[in-house]
């Protein structure tokens, strides 16, 4: 009989970065222990496992610590090969990694960090910059159910956890509509497809609480 594996995930309920890791673990069918962290009072365990960044997510697998959501997703895919989340083709895999960085670096910074600090006029300028970036994702989705084709995978988890199930809730809290059906029909169709996937639905934070949390996070950014 195979020895039981230790798989533990430290996360925060509203964090898109830990939610995407949960999506991957659920897709792979990997049993895991989830440890909820508190943003303002991080546990000694988290600080010991991630002393450099002191952030979630942290994955612990048989005593080994894996940090940063993109790295964790790739580790999960390589460790448990069933239901692959990264494309098998090297070129498609490179594109998925590129667009994942676009989401987490550029769209996140413009659509949340900069927007939280901007006044109303500045937000409109930043919203247009976000639209220009999301248009690249819109083009990638033409003719596809998901970024990888017919099944959810790496880029769906990264972009889905951050944009429709996080940033859009922040924009909702300040009364700003950034992504419209008219301008982004493929993106909106993709979101509807994601909302039907059981493992995704299981990991999406409750809307009202999340909108409140995003308002709180924006306040933290403004006061930092």
Curated annotation (Swiss-Prot):
<dbReference type="InterPro" id="IPR004045">
    <property type="entry name" value="Glutathione_S-Trfase_N"/>
</dbReference>
<feature type="binding site">
    <location>
        <begin position="15"/>
        <end position="16"/>
    </location>
    <ligand>
        <name>glutathione</name>
    </ligand>
</feature>
<dbReference type="GO" id="GO:0006979">
    <property type="term" value="P:response to oxidative stress"/>
</dbReference>
<feature type="domain" description="GST N-terminal">
    <location>
        <begin position="5"/>
        <end position="84"/>
    </location>
</feature>
<keyword id="KW-0216">Detoxification</keyword>
<dbReference type="InterPro" id="IPR004046">
    <property type="entry name" value="GST_C"/>
</dbReference>
<keyword id="KW-0808">Transferase</keyword>
<dbReference type="Pfam" id="PF00043">
    <property type="entry name" value="GST_C"/>
</dbReference>
<dbReference type="GO" id="GO:0005829">
    <property type="term" value="C:cytosol"/>
</dbReference>
<dbReference type="InterPro" id="IPR040079">
    <property type="entry name" value="Glutathione_S-Trfase"/>
</dbReference>
<dbReference type="GO" id="GO:0009506">
    <property type="term" value="C:plasmodesma"/>
</dbReference>
<feature type="binding site">
    <location>
        <begin position="41"/>
        <end position="42"/>
    </location>
    <ligand>
        <name>glutathione</name>
    </ligand>
</feature>
<dbReference type="GO" id="GO:0043295">
    <property type="term" value="F:glutathione binding"/>
</dbReference>
<keyword id="KW-0597">Phosphoprotein</keyword>
<dbReference type="GO" id="GO:0005886">
    <property type="term" value="C:plasma membrane"/>
</dbReference>
<feature type="domain" description="GST C-terminal">
    <location>
        <begin position="89"/>
        <end position="217"/>
    </location>
</feature>
<dbReference type="GO" id="GO:0009407">
    <property type="term" value="P:toxin catabolic process"/>
</dbReference>
<protein>
    <recommendedName>
        <fullName>Glutathione S-transferase U5</fullName>
        <ecNumber>2.5.1.18</ecNumber>
    </recommendedName>
</protein>
<dbReference type="GO" id="GO:0005737">
    <property type="term" value="C:cytoplasm"/>
</dbReference>
<comment type="function">
    <text>In vitro, possesses glutathione S-transferase activity toward 1-chloro-2,4-dinitrobenzene (CDNB) and benzyl isothiocyanate (BITC). May be involved in the conjugation of reduced glutathione to a wide number of exogenous and endogenous hydrophobic electrophiles and have a detoxification role against certain herbicides.</text>
</comment>
<dbReference type="InterPro" id="IPR036282">
    <property type="entry name" value="Glutathione-S-Trfase_C_sf"/>
</dbReference>
<dbReference type="GO" id="GO:0004364">
    <property type="term" value="F:glutathione transferase activity"/>
</dbReference>
<feature type="binding site">
    <location>
        <begin position="68"/>
        <end position="69"/>
    </location>
    <ligand>
        <name>glutathione</name>
    </ligand>
</feature>
<comment type="similarity">
    <text>Belongs to the GST superfamily. Tau family.</text>
</comment>
<dbReference type="InterPro" id="IPR045073">
    <property type="entry name" value="Omega/Tau-like"/>
</dbReference>
<dbReference type="GO" id="GO:0005777">
    <property type="term" value="C:peroxisome"/>
</dbReference>
<feature type="binding site">
    <location>
        <begin position="55"/>
        <end position="56"/>
    </location>
    <ligand>
        <name>glutathione</name>
    </ligand>
</feature>
<keyword id="KW-0346">Stress response</keyword>
<dbReference type="InterPro" id="IPR010987">
    <property type="entry name" value="Glutathione-S-Trfase_C-like"/>
</dbReference>
<dbReference type="GO" id="GO:0006749">
    <property type="term" value="P:glutathione metabolic process"/>
</dbReference>
<keyword id="KW-0963">Cytoplasm</keyword>
<feature type="modified residue" description="Phosphothreonine">
    <location>
        <position position="151"/>
    </location>
</feature>
<dbReference type="InterPro" id="IPR036249">
    <property type="entry name" value="Thioredoxin-like_sf"/>
</dbReference>
<dbReference type="InterPro" id="IPR045074">
    <property type="entry name" value="GST_C_Tau"/>
</dbReference>
<dbReference type="Pfam" id="PF02798">
    <property type="entry name" value="GST_N"/>
</dbReference>
């Amino acid at each position: 009989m195979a020895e039981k594996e230790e798989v533990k995930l430290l996360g925060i309920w509203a964090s898109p970065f830990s939610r995407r890791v949960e999506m991957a673990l659920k897709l792979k069918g990997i049993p895991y222990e989830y440890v909820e962290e508190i943003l303002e009072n991080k546990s000694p365990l988290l600080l010991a496992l991630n002393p450099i960044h002191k952030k979630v997510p942290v994955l612990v697998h048989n005593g080994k610590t894996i940090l940063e959501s993109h790295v964790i997703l790739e580790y999960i895919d390589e460790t448990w090969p069933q239901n692959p989340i990264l494309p098998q083709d090297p070129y498609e895999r490179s594109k998925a990694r590129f667009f994942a960085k676009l989401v987490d670096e550029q769209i996140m910074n413009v659509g949340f960090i900069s927007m939280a600090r901007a006044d109303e006029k500045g937000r409109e300028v930043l919203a247009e910059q976000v639209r220009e970036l999301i248009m690249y994702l819109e083009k990638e989705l033409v003719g596809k159910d998901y970024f990888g084709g017919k099944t959810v995978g790496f880029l769906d988890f990264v972009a889905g956890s951050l944009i429709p199930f996080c940033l859009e809730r922040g924009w909702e809290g300040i009364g700003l509509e950034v992504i419209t059906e008219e301008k982004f029909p493929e993106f909106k169709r993709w979101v509807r497809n994601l909302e039907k996937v059981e493992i995704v639905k299981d990991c999406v934070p409750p809307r009202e609480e999340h909108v409140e949390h995003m308002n709180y996070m924006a306040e933290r950014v403004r006061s930092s």
